């Protein structure tokens, strides 16, 4: 109920307070057929690269639920952590995430560029997950939070690349589609990760391995990196890549690819 209230307040604040970010010449008329998740995705199919890049981002968000959905269970099972230690650990993760996404990312991503930030970030993120999976001492979980949180540079960089693949008039449509897909991962991710934890800590499991969700998360992040690399490399080699009408909008060197009519 409280969450619903905050969501409503957020919507009202956005509607009445936040200014329109697009210039008048970049706006378009409201259409009901596009004002829904399915409609947004259908309209964006004219940009073929988006499917692979959105898939890459979806894998990142599913992988993130390895920590979000099972952190408490895993550390109680493995290290018998108390409520105090669990709360402290999550607080440390929160502070580190805030430092990376609220500060470091402003220096790291411009230096590396969006594309390289995606690869480096996902590699570090995957390494952090893998380390969590096989940690056998409590202190290791705190140390391995560093690469895990540093991997947070990948998500914004990937979203920046996605934004660079559509013109300014379709940015809202893109963000709506991304929000819908990310919301779906909040259903799929917890279900997959908690089920995996439950199975590998049950008496019927071939081996007791509470870190299985982190291992799966690490693999998903590697697949995400490979998928992003494949899509972005294809863009550079295919002839139907045209310069973006708004250079520097976030894509690779301002590239946008549209399907032939």
Name each region found by the language model.
Residues 115-158:
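C-terminal transmembrane helical hairpin of 12-TM major facilitator-type secondary transporters
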Residues 11-17, 215-254, 260-261:
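Multi-pass alpha-helical transporter architecture, strongest
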Residues 69-86:
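Short amphipathic helix-loop junctions that connect adjacent transmembrane helices
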Residues 100-114:
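Helix-to-loop junctions at the C-terminal end of transmembrane segments
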Residues 83-84, 166-180, 207-208:
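Loop-to-transmembrane helix entry/capping segments in MFS-fold secondary transporters
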Residues 1-4, 82, 195-221:
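A membrane-interface helix-boundary motif in multi-pass transporters
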Residues 46-70, 146:
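Pair of pore-lining "gating" transmembrane helices in MFS-fold secondary transporters
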Residues 19-56, 78, 242-261:
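Juxtamembrane intracellular "pre-TM" segments in multi-pass secondary transporters
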